[in-house]
Regions:
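Short strand-loop junctions, especially beta-strand C-caps/beta-turns
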Residues: 181-184, 216
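A structural signal for short, well-ordered beta-strand segments and their strand-loop junctions
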Residues: 130, 178-179, 209-212
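Conserved S-adenosyl-L-methionine
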Residues: 205-217
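Alpha/beta-hydrolase-fold catalytic nucleophile elbow
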Residues: 132, 180, 230
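Core alpha/beta nucleotide-donor-binding catalytic domains of modification enzymes
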Residues: 2-173, 183-188, 192-195, 202
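Short beta-strands and strand-loop turn motifs
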Residues: 176-182, 411
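Class I SAM-dependent DNA methyltransferase catalytic core
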Residues: 215-217, 222-228, 232-450
Length: 450
């Protein structure tokens, strides 16, 4: 095991998935700098990793003037709105009774956030740079404008290139680089640009290894395919790096669900009555129906398991969860004929794998699951309630602990928590990748930590 301290520059840092993985591995590290303009993500990062609390905000004694705090946050483009192409107005808090300026300024200071990467002249040396740039312009769910310098969010990759070129001139190239992005980055449309990037890294002095990995193969019940790119400086590379082998530890969506959920996360009866059973691949054991006055469940309302594997959410016997766990797939049990977007209407079984989490931010776009309830009139019959995943469950599905979630929740709304989770990287996948990169034993941990 390599035990020497690793210094890190965490670009596009989000809520700190990378350092969460390093912490979990027990690797000593020091964050030199982070870089992000999402002010709410910076707030979450500082609360999760840097000890930011309401008490600290109220007792901290070294704040500059409010005018100076507003100037500093504006200068680094914290909170900049790229859709509207306008900076965040920090000056509106100068005469406010609230401590909004103090809160965000202190979060920025504690997380050592440099803000807008395009405004940076250079980065201090660090052994390890992470640079998981925005995916909006290459994602299949986006406009796919591409990686265009100065014009698209994904074009910020070229700011990383500029900073690496500056580091090269300063004889301060990092030993390791890590990039995570959507699978489409290595798809047909964008693979030529990706190959150009890898070739450029080769010329700069790096050997690069990349692979598409799915979170469901690394201990987290979420079907999330992402490309991971590891670059190692040639003068230290022994050529032995390999990506971790996939495994199935049996963890499923139900293992990440909360025991008790606030009623606000359940869909209304009117919407639930629009449920349409659609998974015709299932072959045995009914798992749901929306008919309010049924006495027996008809065949047309039935949902069955695939490939002769028995379904788990069964009307007459709910003690068969492992029978559908074997499918290791995202089990869609039905559709809601209600929302304008097809993916928002999907209903998933909690015995399967979660769909990929996106930035969501509420608005009924959160993944929805079916839960069994016992009918009062006929105790031997079960129906289903449909609800959204909670923010805590989304954090769990990204590999964050409940303690980390609680720290973030202290400063974040539900919509921000959904966004933070969807924007992040699955910690468990990073855990196993970094274990290989830094030669740390990962065999003792094979299950999700909630």
């Amino acid at each position: 095991m390599k035990t020497e301290k690793i210094t890190v520059n965490e670009l596009f840092s989000g809520i700190g998935a990378q350092i969460s993985a390093l912490e979990r591995l027990g690797i000593p590290f020091e964050i030199k700098h982070t870089s992000d303009i999402d002010h709410n993500a910076v707030l979450a990062y500082a609360s999760i990793h840097c000890g930011l609390t309401e008490e600290l905000i109220n007792t901290y004694a070294e704040y500059p003037t409010r005018e100076e705090m507003a100037r500093q946050l504006t200068e680094i483009n914290l909170g900049y709105d790229f859709q509207k192409n306008k900076p965040y107005n920090w000056y509106r808090f100068v005469n406010s009774k609230s401590k909004e300026l103090e809160k965000y300024w202190l979060a920025n200071k504690l997380s050592r956030n440099l803000g807008d990467i395009s405004k940076l002249e250079h980065l201090d040396y660090a052994d390890f740079w992470t640079y998981s740039f925005p995916c909006q312009s290459v994602s299949v769910s986006g406009k796919q404008e591409g990686i265009i310098k100065g014009k698209t969010r994904s074009g910020l990759l070229y700011e990383v290139q500029r900073l690496l070129e500056k580091a090269d001139k300063m004889l301060a190239l990092p030993k390791y680089l890590m990039l995570e992005n959507v699978k489409n980055l290595v798809g047909k449309k964008f693979k030529p640009q990706f190959d150009e990037w890898v070739a450029w890294l080769d010329e700069l002095g790096y050997n690069t290894y990349w692979k598409v990995l799915n979170a469901k193969d690394y201990g987290v019940p979420q079907n999330r395919e992402r490309v991971f790119v590891i670059s190692v400086r040639k003068d230290i590379d022994d050529g032995k790096f390999e990506f971790p082998q996939p495994f199935d530890n049996g963890v499923r969506l139900k293992d990440a669900l909360e025991d008790k959920v606030d009623e606000k996360y359940y869909l209304s009866e009117d919407i639930q009555n629009r449920l349409i059973i659609t998974d015709k691949t299932l072959t045995k054991n009914v798992i749901g129906t929306t008919k309010p006055s049924f006495r027996t469940i008809g065949r047309r309302d039935s949902v069955y398991s695939e490939n002769s594997i028995m379904g788990t959410l069964v009307a007459t016997d709910y003690k068969q969860p492992k029978q559908i766990l074997e499918t290791n797939r995202c089990v869609k049990v039905g559709d809601l004929n209600y929302y304008p977007y097809e993916t928002s209407n999907r209903i998933y079984s909690k015995e399967g794998i979660s769909p990929t989490l996106t930035t969501m931010q509420g608005g009924n776009t959160e993944p929805k699951i079916a839960e069994p309830i016992v009918a009062v009139i006929e105790p031997d019959v079960k129906s289903f309630r449909v609800r959204k995943l909670t923010p805590k469950e989304c954090y769990r599905l990204m590999g964050f602990t409940d303690e980390q979630f609680d720290r973030s929740q202290a400063f974040s709304s539900d919509s921000q928590l959904y966004k933070q989770a969807g924007n992040s990287i699955v910690v468990d996948v990073l855990y196993y990748i970094f274990g290989k990169l830094f030669e740390v034993d990962t065999e003792t941990r094979k299950e999700i930590e909630c």
